[in-house]
């Protein structure tokens, strides 16, 4: 027997010590999240050429991070008494959003990884600390995200009669366009964003502890929630591979990397929705357009919107009319959604019935698309009118892309029910959680040996 004295038990943390440690951990999560978003947004803006903006790169970077958390950035313009400007921008750079959500969620859960269960008060304290610090950081970014740029109208190559007539006159009054952050809506949507990130982090984590009252919801919710996260990340990974191939084999790699760093999920999650039969509508007019594949830009400029001739419908058939390879979106969606359903079934308890798994998968997929489809919305407009009699086409344009949300959600529910059932059937051939191998008894009474001393 060892004569070494036993190690004394570590004293319990005092309330003040627990509060200080929780605050430091929350600060680390917030700083890591904002830092990751800033790095990704900075790389995307650099690839897009924003580093050449006269004194405005920092403000644009802050504005992109604000928009990535759901904040509202307002565009404004001033061209004196002779002209007016109209500007609007609604979009989320989802690559920045996704990276920030993953990093913040991971750092939020990391201190809890060794806990079997956690108290509701402790969980609320940790979440509340992250939320408060996140909103403080968002308010600081909002103060930085403001800048004005001067527009040079004359001397262009575009053949616009109004531009030729009024260009020099407008240059003399120094027309400008700028952006500001609307603090109230930014903090409100930022609050919803960070609460959603923390909630989703708890739902998709397979190891994070829950309060004892919520443990019973762990088995029916977490396997399918985790599988839906894997589905969204799988689409982003496929899009990343395709984007790298395009950057290596075609011209203008900087533009491709700008899309990868800023808006990759905007494209890949749209591809998921289109692949299951959903549709978007939109248009692209003027000299600028969406940083998207040429096939999508061609559809948006085609004006095939049926009764609403000014809008184009983006679905499988319209994309395939531009490039037949678009039909691959359908089998890719079938394979990846089935893989997600199978992964959820394997991680679910063996006692889960097929219809239960199908229903859970259908509801989870529908909720996933209820979140993923609306955030792909893009609305951007800018125009410069002279004396109210027209718009300078060389300095105006419009980009619109919005989903038919409820149609996409309904299709996701149907796909989840069908492929959830099929995934459960496939998983029934795999040993699953909670499954116990039954001993085999032979007619002669022989069987596996029992425990020592058993009769």
Regions found by a protein language model. Give the residues of each.
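Selective recognition of specific alpha-helical transmembrane segments in multi-pass small-molecule
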Residues: 31-39, 130-142, 227-243, 367-368, ...
């Amino acid at each position: 027997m060892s004569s070494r004295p036993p190690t004394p038990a570590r004293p319990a943390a005092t309330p003040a010590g627990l509060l200080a440690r929780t605050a430091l951990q929350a600060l680390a999560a917030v700083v890591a999240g904002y830092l990751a978003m800033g790095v990704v947004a900075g790389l995307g803006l650099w690839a897009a050429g924003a580093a050449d903006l006269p004194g405005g790169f920092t403000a644009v970077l802050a504005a992109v991070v604000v928009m990535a958390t759901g904040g509202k950035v307002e565009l404004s313009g001033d061209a004196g008494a002779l002209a007016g400007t109209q500007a609007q921008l609604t979009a989320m750079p989802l690559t920045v959003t996704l990276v920030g959500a993953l990093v913040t969620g991971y750092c939020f859960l990391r201190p809890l990884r060794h806990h079997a269960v956690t108290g509701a008060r402790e969980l609320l304290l940790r979440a509340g600390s992250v939320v408060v610090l996140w909103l403080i950081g968002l308010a600081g970014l909002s103060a930085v995200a403001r800048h004005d740029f001067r527009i040079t109208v004359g001397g262009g190559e575009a053949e616009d009669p109004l531009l030729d007539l009024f260009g020099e006159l407008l240059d003399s009054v120094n027309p400008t366009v700028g952006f500001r952050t609307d603090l109230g809506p930014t903090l409100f949507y930022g609050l919803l964003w960070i609460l959603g990130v923390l909630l989703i982090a708890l739902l998709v984590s397979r190891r994070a502890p829950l309060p004892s009252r919520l443990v019973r919801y762990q088995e029916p919710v977490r396997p399918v929630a985790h599988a839906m996260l894997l589905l969204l990340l799988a689409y982003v990974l496929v899009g990343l591979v395709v984007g790298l191939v395009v950057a290596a084999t075609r011209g203008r790699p900087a533009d491709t990397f700008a899309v990868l760093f800023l808006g990759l999920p905007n494209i890949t999650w749209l591809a998921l929705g289109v692949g299951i039969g959903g549709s978007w509508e939109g248009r692209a007019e003027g000299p600028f357009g969406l940083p998207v594949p040429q096939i999508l830009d061609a559809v948006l400029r085609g004006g095939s919107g049926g009764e609403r001739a000014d809008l184009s419908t983006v679905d499988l058939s319209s994309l395939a009319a531009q490039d037949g390879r678009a039909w691959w979106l359908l089998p890719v969606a079938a394979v990846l959604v089935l893989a997600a359903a199978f992964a959820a079934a394997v991680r679910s308890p063996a006692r889960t019935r097929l219809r239960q798994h199908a229903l859970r998968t259908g509801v989870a997929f529908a909720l996933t698309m209820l979140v993923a489809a609306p955030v792909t919305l893009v609305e951007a407009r800018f125009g410069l009118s002279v004396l109210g009699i027209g718009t300078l086409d060389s300095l105006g344009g419009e980009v619109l892309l919005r989903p038919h949300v409820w149609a996409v959600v309904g299709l996701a529910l149907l796909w989840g029910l069908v492929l959830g059932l099929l995934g459960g059937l496939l998983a029934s051939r795999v040993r699953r959680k909670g499954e116990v191998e039954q001993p085999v008894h032979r007619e002669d009474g022989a069987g596996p040996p029992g425990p020592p001393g058993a009769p």
